[in-house]
């Protein structure tokens, strides 16, 4: 009987140890599932941040230095069809929008230097190639446009001494310079020899080199830029990832009246700090824009199954309001609503930037000319589609119109009849339609797999843990009942049988059972 008790006790002890172990493992699985539900995406975010840092030799660095995309530039030129009538009769200028003239573009960063302080310095190199197969016309198409060098010079002379204006008129008469020129589209963009610039080149001392030898709206952009850009790599924190730190060794501009407006702390438009929300305000800096361009959330988008946020400038970005007074250092009158004066960045040429077709601008600007259709937000709005977790631009359209603010100068006979007007020259859009498949695959892997993995791990581990807990508790309870039953049975078996007294005869003697 004692052997059976020992065997039962041993069996019960082994049974209990096994299920207590199962219970411990089940609790661990449940806690792991809860941990995954709470911290898995944060850990993935930390890993992604680590991989995004621009380190030489990494995939991110290679794609940043040599982007695997082929951006494009589409140019639309406003051809003036009634230049003589406009000058002689005061007619409204009639414009014919030609284009698009399409150029494919190759981007890369060259002369990259690691400053060992969480920043890189580099030069942009851009190569443009005309694409006749995508264009509506050839880049040698002739167009009539305002003579920008001449009209810039006359507008700047408005407040000069009268004899200087008369002398300028004589020089222009000798050189046969007229307010409108006929050039090819390629010359307008990439440069042509201008008589005024040629004269200035001959007059100006050699030690005072002119900013450019030819005139072109994109002059000097086809090739390696001389500008040195310093950008944060993310090594010291992702809050400034992809943000410009210095431009030509300067941390801010010198043109505007406040530090906020002189700031250049923005992205170049290709990468942004990760973990973007709908409440984030992005900022893009471009030298030709001469300021930071703020971008705010517009709507959610989906590109090849990848979710993103579309950001666009606020409607009052070029408004004549209190917030933008810092961009008007000379004081009122400032640029009209919808225009931004970049003359301080363009050697005092009266260049005004706007969105195409004067989108978000004063309607009177478009009404001053004929031939420009009403603006369409879908065609003329600037936007960038960003993958919010990684801060990578997936699609973009930088749409800008270049205008010339002409001032009437009656003392210069060539432009005496040229009224005060904001004359549109051309507009262009630059950007990418979508990323290559290898980049999109990486984005899907980084953004779509982790949430699925988190749910699978958290729900799966938690469910398995809960089931094992229920099973272990059930078995332990049953084991406890079984042990109680065995103890009870053992107690009953060990109890001695009741004794019986021997039979006696009538005289009191015990009866012998034997015969």
Residue ranges, per PLM feature:
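Intrinsically disordered, low-complexity C-terminal regions of metazoan proteins
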Residues: 514-515
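Internal glycine-rich, Lys/Arg-flanked active-site/core loops of soluble domains
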Residues: 311
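Extracellular or lumenal secretory-pathway regions
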Residues: 2-307, 315-510
């Amino acid at each position: 009987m004692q052997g059976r008790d020992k065997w039962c006790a041993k069996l019960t002890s082994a049974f209990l140890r096994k299920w207590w172990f199962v219970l411990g493992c089940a609790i661990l699985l449940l806690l792991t599932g809860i941990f995954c539900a709470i911290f898995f995406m944060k850990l993935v975010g930390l890993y992604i941040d680590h991989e995004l840092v621009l380190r030489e030799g990494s995939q991110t660095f290679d794609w940043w230095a040599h982007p695997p995309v082929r951006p494009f530039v589409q140019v639309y030129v406003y051809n003036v069809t009634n230049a003589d009538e406009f000058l002689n009769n005061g007619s409204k200028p009639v414009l014919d929008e030609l284009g698009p003239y399409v150029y494919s573009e190759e981007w890369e960063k060259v002369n990259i230097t690691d400053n060992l302080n969480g920043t890189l310095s580099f030069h942009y190199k851009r190569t443009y190639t005309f694409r006749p197969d995508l264009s509506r016309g050839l880049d040698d198409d002739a167009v009539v446009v305002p003579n920008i060098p001449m009209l810039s010079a006359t507008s700047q002379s408005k407040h000069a001494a009268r004899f200087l204006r008369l002398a300028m008129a004589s020089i222009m008469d000798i050189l046969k310079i007229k307010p409108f020129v006929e050039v090819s589209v390629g010359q307008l963009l990439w440069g042509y020899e201008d008589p005024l610039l040629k004269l200035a080149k001959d007059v100006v001392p050699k030690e005072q080199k002119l900013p450019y030898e030819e005139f072109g709206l994109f002059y000097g952009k086809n090739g390696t830029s001389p500008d040195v850009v310093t950008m944060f790599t993310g090594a010291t924190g992702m809050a400034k990832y992809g943000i410009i730190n210095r431009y030509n060794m300067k941390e801010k501009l010198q043109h505007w009246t406040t530090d906020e407006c002189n700031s250049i702390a923005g992205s170049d438009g290709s990468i942004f700090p990760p973990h973007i929300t709908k409440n984030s305000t992005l900022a893009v800096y471009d030298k030709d824009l001469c300021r930071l361009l703020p971008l705010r959330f517009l709507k959610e988008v989906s590109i090849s199954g990848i979710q993103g946020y579309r950001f666009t400038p606020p409607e009052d970005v070029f408004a004549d309001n209190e917030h933008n007074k810092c961009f008007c250092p000379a004081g009122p009158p400032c640029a009209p609503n919808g225009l931004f004066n970049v003359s301080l960045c363009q050697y005092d040429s009266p260049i005004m930037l706007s969105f195409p077709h004067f989108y978000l601008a004063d309607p009177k600007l478009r009404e001053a000319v004929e031939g420009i259709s009403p603006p369409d937000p879908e065609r003329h709005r600037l936007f960038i589609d960003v993958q919010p977790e990684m801060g990578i631009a997936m699609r973009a359209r930088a749409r800008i119109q270049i205008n010339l603010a002409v001032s009437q100068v009656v003392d210069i006979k060539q432009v005496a009849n040229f009224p005060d007007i904001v004359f549109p020259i051309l507009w262009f859009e630059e950007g990418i339609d979508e990323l290559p498949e290898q980049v999109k695959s990486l984005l899907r892997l980084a953004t779509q797999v982790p949430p699925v993995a988190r749910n699978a791990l958290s729900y799966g581990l938690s469910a398995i843990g809960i089931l094992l807990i229920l099973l272990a508790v059930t078995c332990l309870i049953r084991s406890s009942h079984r042990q109680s039953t065995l103890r009870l049975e053992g107690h009953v078996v060990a109890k001695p049988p009741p004794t019986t007294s021997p039979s006696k005869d009538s005289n009191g003697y015990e009866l012998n059972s034997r015969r």
